[in-house]
């Protein structure tokens, strides 16, 4: 059996999966350790054998969205001063004017003076987390590794950009590395608390973490690359929705309704839309491959404030809805108005009883505008799903799958907008279902250098001699074959980098890097 747990900012949801959803449980997330332990105690009895636990969380994403990230610095290795391009986003950058060229050759090595000056700079600014990023490092990470080793020996937490992505988009790699560094300690603390809570009850069960692309990885891998799991919570919700949508061919929107934020996902032919080239979070354009999500600052616990004569919907949570004993009326109370006397009492108490119609129209207009923005975003470029690519496809959804705790309360508003609304069974724990059923994201990295006549896939200790005629077609086949030997799931190539090594005017070899992984999906 499998347990899925989603740790959100408001609630922790958990499910026990066997032949379907056997048990489910929801508890407040105020104390992370206690909420995880309580969830496990409610789901497990002595006769159950737990095969794995998969976890998703929005806690790190919430920290980034609210600006609650740690001080982090970037050690930039390139041949031109670029720090001024990032100074409004990254306060602490040290540029070392060493560099590797586009062929991966070291043109100017790192000097001891650069390293010692950078060390002094970061210490004086009380920086503990450092991201090291070298231009063209995917073609040769030697300078990143040299700097990374130096800073580690001096007590810093270090993230090297080339370990996060093999793509050559230098600006996005800088931002990805910075983001990973700035959540390094926060993420480790969250993961450590989760792991210790689980281990207090289940000593040997495999623990997996949901990635932003909807796959799951062992907790030991996730902790090395925290940036890959930043949108873990929304990804789990989308994978949980896939459980309900696998037989649908229409365009669909999924809305995961939360306390003060709701996440919007997109489906075409029962397949979620994906950001293949990398997501943007706040001002951070990254190389993190993720399921496409659009956040709407509205949830079941959102309250109403007035600025003069203007109604303002607040996304600052002030407690549970009034009808459930909270301090103020919320979107949930509005949805229940006319059915729940407690909700009506709350609107009277706040002097809003004569403004019900205005508030409802504002909510409906607010949701409509965000859905239009979300659909426009999907249609603004070529559409990729986890199964296929659409070049001139127009996404035009008529149906909405509502999940999350506030789903029943949002239906009233979406009905008014003309959508066909579906609320599935176990809607309130859809995210935990997605975490439980998401496929393991087995990944293999192939490196080949025809000049040195060597090929390696480190994850499986595979090494092979190759000849000068070896190319990317053969490399892809090896990756596919090796992945298929360890999994029955569909596999895909997610990164490919090939460049010719030139001496004089002659091509003397090829350097090839191929990354393959299991396609995101469900294990059933």
Model-predicted segments: where are they?
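N-terminally biased helix-coil "hinge/interface" segments that flank
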Residues: 1-524
């Amino acid at each position: 059996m499998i347990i899925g747990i989603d740790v959100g900012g408001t609630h922790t949801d958990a499910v026990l999966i066997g032949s379907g959803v056997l048990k489910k449980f929801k508890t407040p997330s105020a104390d992370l350790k206690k909420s995880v332990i309580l969830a496990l105690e409610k789901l497990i009895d002595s006769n159950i054998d737990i095969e794995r636990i998969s976890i998703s969380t929005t806690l790190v994403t919430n920290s980034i969205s609210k600006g609650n990230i740690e001080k982090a610095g970037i050690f930039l290795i390139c041949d031109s001063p670029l720090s001024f391009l990032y100074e409004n986003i990254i306060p602490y950058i040290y540029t070392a004017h060493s560099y590797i060229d586009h062929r991966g050759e070291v043109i100017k090595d790192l000097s001891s003076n650069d390293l010692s000056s950078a060390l002094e700079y970061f210490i004086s600014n009380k920086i503990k987390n450092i991201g090291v990023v070298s231009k063209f490092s995917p073609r040769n990470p030697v300078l990143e590794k040299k700097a990374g080793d130096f800073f580690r020996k001096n007590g810093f937490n270090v993230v090297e950009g080339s370990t996060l992505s093999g793509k050559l988009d230098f600006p996005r790699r800088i931002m990805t590395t910075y983001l990973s560094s700035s959540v390094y300690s926060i993420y480790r603390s969250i993961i450590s608390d989760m792991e210790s809570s689980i281990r207090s009850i289940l000593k040997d069960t495999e623990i997996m973490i949901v990635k932003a692309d909807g796959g799951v990885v062992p907790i030991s891998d996730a902790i090395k690359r925290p940036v890959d799991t930043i949108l873990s919570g929304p990804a789990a919700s989308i994978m949980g929705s896939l459980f309900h949508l696998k037989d649908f061919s229409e365009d669909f929107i999924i809305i995961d309704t939360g306390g003060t934020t709701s996440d919007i996902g997109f489906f075409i032919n029962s397949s979620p839309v994906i950001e293949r080239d990398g997501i943007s979070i706040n001002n951070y354009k990254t190389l993190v491959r993720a399921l496409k999500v659009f956040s709407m600052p509205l949830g079941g616990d959102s309250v109403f404030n007035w600025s003069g004569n203007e109604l303002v919907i607040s996304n600052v949570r002030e407690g549970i809805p009034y009808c459930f004993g909270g301090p103020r009326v919320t979107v949930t109370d509005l949805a229940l108005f006319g059915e729940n006397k407690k909700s009506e009492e709350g609107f009277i108490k706040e002097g809003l009883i004569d403004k019900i119609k205005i508030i409802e129209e504002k909510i409906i207009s607010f949701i409509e505008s965000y859905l239009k923005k979300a659909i426009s975003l999907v249609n603004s470029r070529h559409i990729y799903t986890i199964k296929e690519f659409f070049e001139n496809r127009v996404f035009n959804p008529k149906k909405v799958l509502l999940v999350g705790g506030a789903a029943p309360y949002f239906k009233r508003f979406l009905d008014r907008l003309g959508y066909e609304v579906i609320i599935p069974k176990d809607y309130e724990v859809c995210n935990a279902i997605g975490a439980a059923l998401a496929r393991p994201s087995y990944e293999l990295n192939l490196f080949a250098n025809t000049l040195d006549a060597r090929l390696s896939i480190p994850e499986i200790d595979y090494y092979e001699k190759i000849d000068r005629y070896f190319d990317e077609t053969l490399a892809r086949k090896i990756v596919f074959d090796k992945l298929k030997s360890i999994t029955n799931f569909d596999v895909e190539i997610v990164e490919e980098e090939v460049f010719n090594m030139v001496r004089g005017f002659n091509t003397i070899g090829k350097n090839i890097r191929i990354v393959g992984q299991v396609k995101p999906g469900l294990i059933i």
